[in-house]
Every structure is written in structure tokens, then in C-alpha cells.
Amino acid sequence: MSDLTVVKGLQSEIYVPITPPPVWTPVTKELKDMTVALVTAAGVHMKADKRFNLAGDFSFRVIPGDASVNDMMVSHGGYDNGDVNKDINCMFPIDPMRTLAKEGFIKALAPINIGFMGGGGDQKKFSEETGPEIARQLKEEGVDAVLLTAGUGTCHRSAVIVQRAIEESGIPTIIIAALPPVVRQNGTPRAVAPLVPMGANAGEPNNPEMQKAICTDSLKQLVEIPSAGKIVPLPYEYVAKV
């Protein structure tokens, strides 16, 4: 059987997604000198904020770097919220990141971090409005790098759209992916892939050691990945108990 050949301009009734051209911002600082922001498509926001529209929402919420996880919640219907409701850190690892800052592994967690609901949203809006505005705000805050997570399959696509916008603004990024094929197809600049289910990208809930290790290795790969589009497996496994 011959290999599949793709011919430019050939039309087909079968939709074949096209991976967008690579975007890439090189890392120019050591991790110990970086202020790092968290960005998630998993629907995380402050309890005091307006909930996301579960049918589709391209807005985003700012989460302060000093906010308590007890004051956060999730509005998202596209993935099982069981783990993240036990521990926000398994999708939005803000406590592990604060620990890494305290230990000097990174300079600081950014004063603003971002949550949005990537499932069912308008992809054009994410590309033309949400992503560029998130990038602008992070740039204004002097963010040096961004660590992302995503929930469902559509979330992973939306997260990469935002990731690419941040990267295009001059900030290097890396996403912790539960669905590596989705982020690859959508043109992730950099990604890591622990063996985790959707809804616990940063590791098992209430397992700060695993979460810290995943964040640590993700940030190391931010520096070590040599070119756009590479996805590095991480040696951590969590199987959700359902």
C-alpha cells in the first residue's frame, strides 16, 4: 500500500485539518530569573467572578497570583470536574508554582494569571480577540514565560490558539497536555505530556509532590525544547478513580 500523498489545491469531501505554521519565541532567561504566569482553558476562575457560559464563552478571568485556591472554582461542562473540584491545583497548579518561586527555581509567579473556558467557544474570537488580549495583559505585567493547561478536546484546541498568540507576542510558552495529538495538530509551540486524564493535567489531586514535579519538568522543557512543535512525554502517571 502506498503512502498517503497530499496535493496542494486538491479538493475532497473529507475534511483534513491543516496544522498552522509554527510560531516560536526563544527562551532568553534562566528559569531562576523568570516571572511565570499560569493560563488555563479549564474554566478556572475566582468564586466572586461571573461564571463562564457552558454553551460557549470566549471571555477570560484574571486570577491574582496571591489568590487562595479556596476562593477559586470551575465553570466547565466539557470534562469531568471530579478531580479539579477536589483540588484546583491539578488543573491550575498555583500552589506548586508558588512553592517553586519560594525555592528560587523561578523568580516569581506572575501577579496576574488567566482562566478561560475553552470548550465550545468561537475559535475565530479566540484567535482574533481573546488570545491577543491575554497576551497583551501578560506582556504589560512583564511576564517572562507562560505555563498552560486545558480540559476537554476543544479546550486543548482553544488553549493552543491562545498559546500561539502569547508566543507571537514574544513570550515563550509550554502547555501540559492530556491530549497530545490535539495540541500537535493545532500547532503548539511546545508541550509536555504526562500520563494523566483530562481534568488532571498537572497531576493527581491532593498530590503536591507529583504536581510540583510535573511543573518543574514542564518548565525545564520550556528551556530545553529546541524547536517548535515538539511534545515531550513526562514520566508521571495518574489514573482517575471513577
Swiss-Prot record:
Keywords: Cytoplasm, Oxidoreductase, Selenocysteine. It is found in: Cytoplasm. Its EC number is 1.21.4.1. One of its GO terms (cellular component) is cytoplasm. GO terms for molecular function: D-proline reductase activity. This subunit is carbonylated in vitro on an unidentified residue. It catalyses: [PrdC protein]-Se-L-selenocysteinyl-S-L-cysteine + 5-aminopentanoate = [PrdC protein]-L-selenocysteine/L-cysteine + D-proline. The keyword Oxidoreductase applies. Pfam families: GRDB. InterPro entries: D_pro_red_PrdB, Various_sel_PB. The active site is at U152 (nucleophile). Consists of 3 subunits of 23, 26 and 45 kDa (alpha, gamma and beta respectively). The molecular weight of the complex is approximately 870 kDa, suggesting a decameric structure, if all 3 subunits are present in equal stoichiometry. The reaction mechanism first involves the formation of an adduct (and not a Schiff base) between the nitrogen of proline and the pyruvoyl group of the alpha subunit. The selenol anion of selenocysteine in PrdB nucleophilically attacks the alpha-carbon, resulting in cleavage of the N-C bond of the proline ring. This intermediate is then transformed to the oxidized gamma subunit containing a mixed selenide/sulfide group and to the 5-aminovalerate adduct of the alpha subunit. The final product, 5-aminovalerate, is formed by hydrolysis. D-proline reductase catalyzes the reductive cleavage of a C-N bond in D-proline resulting in the formation of 5-aminovalerate. The alpha subunit has been shown to bind D-proline, presumably via the pyruvoyl group. This is D-proline reductase subunit gamma. It comes from Acetoanaerobium sticklandii (strain ATCC 12662 / DSM 519 / JCM 1433 / CCUG 9281 / NCIMB 10654 / HF) (Clostridium sticklandii).
